[in-house]
Amino acid sequence: MLKFEILATDTSSHARRGTLTLNHGVVQTPIFMPVGTYGTVKGVMPRSLREMGAQIILGNTFHLWMRPGLDVMQSFGGLHGFEQWDKPILTDSGGFQVWSLGSMRKITEEGVHFASPVNGDKLFMSPEVSMQIQTTLNSDIVMQLDECTPYETNGHKTTEAEARKSMEMSRRWAVRSKNEFERLGNPNALFGIVQGGMYKNLRQESLEALVEMDFPGYAVGGVSVGEPKDEMLDIMAHTPHRLPAHKPRYLMGVGTPEDLVEGVAQGVDMFDCVMPTRNARNGTLFTRYGDLKIRNARHKTDHQPLDPSCTCHACAGTEGVSWNDGGRGGFSRAYLHHLDRCGEMLGPMLTTIHNLHYYLNLMREVREALDAGQFGAFRARFKAERARGV
């Protein structure tokens, strides 16, 4: 089941505000979706995710197929029961992970033959297998199996002919994914994925073919795969707003806070990215006034929280009152610097909570600006504040 309703639009851009109703709940859009690769958002309890405003999270079809396997998933009635998350879940198709195996896999028209990275077993992923796995996972949003078109391979930039061949295979796999999804009687929603590399004419062909197939929602894939930022932004400016206005649009694997706000302006409703969680574990924190490197020596004696305007548990403690509003319940930069230096596990747990809170709160502010008809002013203020630096 999927119902998408647009509540407001921005007159100066393609931005829109909506609600997405799925089998496990209603999602307010635009939305950022935390990534839970192995059935968990690394280091974060489900309760904490709910408290910080997460409405929908991702699961990784490929990795959950490898471990713990479909028998275990089936015994729990799907991924929701297994990871104790009662809100919507989106699962990717497994295509990107199989593509990432490089020399360990062989792609044919039928599907992908590859060696398991867990135990070396010979395995096969096809559009039909992907649909069967995702049906067992019972995710609210299922993604078609696609071939992720690389930007370059061993220093060789993908040509238009190579990108076309890849895009056309993804298009044929979309047909097979949809047929199998319907044969299985899956009650959830299947999204098609627009491919075509960095070639706008191929993106347009892919888009038109998928729209003809009438998917409940659409994703833009094959971006943030090693291409220069300006080329990624070029595709972002071209493709999302050309998708059907009455259906949700999902930009896969993107990106920085600036990318998210720009994506909203280009008509994107849904985002996911490992950046907030991965960067948190590597000591890079997102704040209203730019990125903060907690490993820098200057933070050794700094009494401030990561972001004085932030109300996350790391910055504001259990009271949830920011430093700017008089609260003093959070942890100092000095303490988080110390935890990182010592390799204490609490460090990345707190920084992950902060980064996810920042992303989710950013999307909340975007929604509020759209509700108020002030997205243009918000966008300008956001850019100025982020450029100021911490």
Curated annotation (Swiss-Prot):
Quaternary structure note: Homodimer. Within each dimer, one monomer is responsible for RNA recognition and catalysis, while the other monomer binds to the replacement base PreQ1.
GO cellular component, one term: cytosol
InterPro entries, A to Z: ArchSynthase1/Queuine_TRR, TGT, TGT-like_sf, tRNA_ribo_trans-like
Binding-site list for substrate: 92-96, 146, 195, 222
One matching Pfam family: TGT
Metabolic or biological pathway, per its Swiss-Prot or TrEMBL entry: tRNA modification; tRNA-queuosine biosynthesis
Cofactor(s) it depends on: Zn(2+)
Function of the protein: Catalyzes the base-exchange of a guanine (G) residue with the queuine precursor 7-aminomethyl-7-deazaguanine (PreQ1) at position 34 (anticodon wobble position) in tRNAs with GU(N) anticodons (tRNA-Asp, -Asn, -His and -Tyr). Catalysis occurs through a double-displacement mechanism. The nucleophile active site attacks the C1' of nucleotide 34 to detach the guanine base from the RNA, forming a covalent enzyme-RNA intermediate. The proton acceptor active site deprotonates the incoming PreQ1, allowing a nucleophilic attack on the C1' of the ribose to form the product.
EC nos: 2.4.2.29
BP GO terms, sorted: queuosine biosynthetic process; tRNA wobble guanine modification; tRNA-guanine transglycosylation
Cofactor note: Binds 1 zinc ion per subunit.
Active site (UniProt): 92 (proton acceptor), 272 (nucleophile)
Recorded catalytic activity of this chain's protein: 7-aminomethyl-7-carbaguanine + guanosine(34) in tRNA = 7-aminomethyl-7-carbaguanosine(34) in tRNA + guanine
GO MF annotations in UniProt: metal ion binding; tRNA-guanosine(34) queuine transglycosylase activity
Domain of life: Bacteria
Family: Belongs to the queuine tRNA-ribosyltransferase family.
Entry keyword set: Glycosyltransferase, Metal-binding, Queuosine biosynthesis, Transferase, tRNA processing, Zinc
Protein name per the record: Queuine tRNA-ribosyltransferase
Organism: Acidovorax ebreus (strain TPSY)
Annotated region (RNA binding), positions in chain: 253-259, 277-281
Chain sites annotated for binding Zn(2+): 310, 312, 315, 354
